[in-house]
Amino acid sequence: MACLKGAKGTVQDAPDFNDKEDAETLRHAMKGLGTDEDTILKLLISRSNKQRQQIALTYKTLFGRDLTDDLKSELSGKFETLLVALMVPAHLYDACELRNAIKGLGTLENVIIEIMASRTAAEVKNIKETYKKEFDSDLEKDIVGDTSGNFERLLVSLVQANRDPVGKVDEGQVENDAKALFDAGENKWGTDEETFISILSTRGVGHLRKVFDQYMTISGYQIEESIQSETGGHFEKLLLAVVKSIRSIQGYLAEVLYNSMKGAGTDDQTLIRVLVSRSEIDLFNIRQTFRKHYGKSLHAMIQSDTSGDYRNALLLLCGEIDD
């Protein structure tokens, strides 16, 4: 959502890449009695998604077998889920996660909120096209069929991917938007949700950051405080996620990661999704933000919250240890 200038992932193209050697190494690691999980995880995580796709193609050519199917049959549990996620083409991953969230058992609103609030307009357009091509279904129609109320309306607005890409900020419009948001919430009885939906789904990132500052000046409240007092349910959660992503995409996703591991139990699906989807974009930056916000490293929290090959794979995906 926010500008990703200076963003850095933890996974890059491997130098001296040899897809034939990698395919043979993976086949050997899964052939016969036992599976060499350590070799598999180290090889796949040290290759970019594009390189993994080439390995899968070469694997099928050499052995007449599907690499993902072999991983599924040889691995198990959360470790399998993570490694299989790494094999999904990057452009397809978000579309698959949304499809599962909408069409699985019950609607996984947190997944829909996380993806739709944090992706750029260009990424959302790509997700829509991929979703249509892969599932022969319209993302907007599926969302409308599975959600309701203002939550549905804001999602539909975000799916249009019409956020202003222009970096220039019009100070007069900033003032107008801040006042419109104030008049739609804190300054009236009830809440004019349409104003929040319209402004938060169409204005540019730099513009909205200025709007949030001006809103604080006018109202004496942070916009997040007003959203919490004026709205509720999934609509509130989505509004907050959009605002947080606009302020700092890395800050928002660091919070998502922290919440996936804090307290009893771990939301492994969220942990996997964020690490996999951001590993080649800005996971290094998310790691830095995580430490700054929570006083502990992402590595340390993963170390204490997970175990076995699954933990080893997650830690490797996070990049070098920064404790």
Curated annotation (Swiss-Prot):
<keyword id="KW-0111">Calcium/phospholipid-binding</keyword>
<dbReference type="InterPro" id="IPR037104">
    <property type="entry name" value="Annexin_sf"/>
</dbReference>
<keyword id="KW-0106">Calcium</keyword>
<comment type="function">
    <text>Calcium/phospholipid-binding protein which promotes membrane fusion and is involved in exocytosis.</text>
</comment>
<dbReference type="GO" id="GO:0005634">
    <property type="term" value="C:nucleus"/>
</dbReference>
<dbReference type="InterPro" id="IPR001464">
    <property type="entry name" value="Annexin"/>
</dbReference>
<comment type="similarity">
    <text>Belongs to the annexin family.</text>
</comment>
<keyword id="KW-0677">Repeat</keyword>
<feature type="repeat" description="Annexin 1">
    <location>
        <begin position="17"/>
        <end position="88"/>
    </location>
</feature>
<dbReference type="GO" id="GO:0005737">
    <property type="term" value="C:cytoplasm"/>
</dbReference>
<feature type="repeat" description="Annexin 2">
    <location>
        <begin position="89"/>
        <end position="160"/>
    </location>
</feature>
<dbReference type="InterPro" id="IPR018252">
    <property type="entry name" value="Annexin_repeat_CS"/>
</dbReference>
<dbReference type="GO" id="GO:0005544">
    <property type="term" value="F:calcium-dependent phospholipid binding"/>
</dbReference>
<dbReference type="GO" id="GO:0050819">
    <property type="term" value="P:negative regulation of coagulation"/>
</dbReference>
<protein>
    <recommendedName>
        <fullName>Annexin A5</fullName>
    </recommendedName>
</protein>
<dbReference type="GO" id="GO:0001786">
    <property type="term" value="F:phosphatidylserine binding"/>
</dbReference>
<dbReference type="InterPro" id="IPR002392">
    <property type="entry name" value="ANX5"/>
</dbReference>
<keyword id="KW-0041">Annexin</keyword>
<dbReference type="InterPro" id="IPR018502">
    <property type="entry name" value="Annexin_repeat"/>
</dbReference>
<dbReference type="GO" id="GO:0005886">
    <property type="term" value="C:plasma membrane"/>
</dbReference>
<dbReference type="GO" id="GO:0005509">
    <property type="term" value="F:calcium ion binding"/>
</dbReference>
<dbReference type="Pfam" id="PF00191">
    <property type="entry name" value="Annexin"/>
</dbReference>
<dbReference type="GO" id="GO:0012506">
    <property type="term" value="C:vesicle membrane"/>
</dbReference>
<feature type="repeat" description="Annexin 3">
    <location>
        <begin position="172"/>
        <end position="244"/>
    </location>
</feature>
<feature type="repeat" description="Annexin 4">
    <location>
        <begin position="248"/>
        <end position="319"/>
    </location>
</feature>
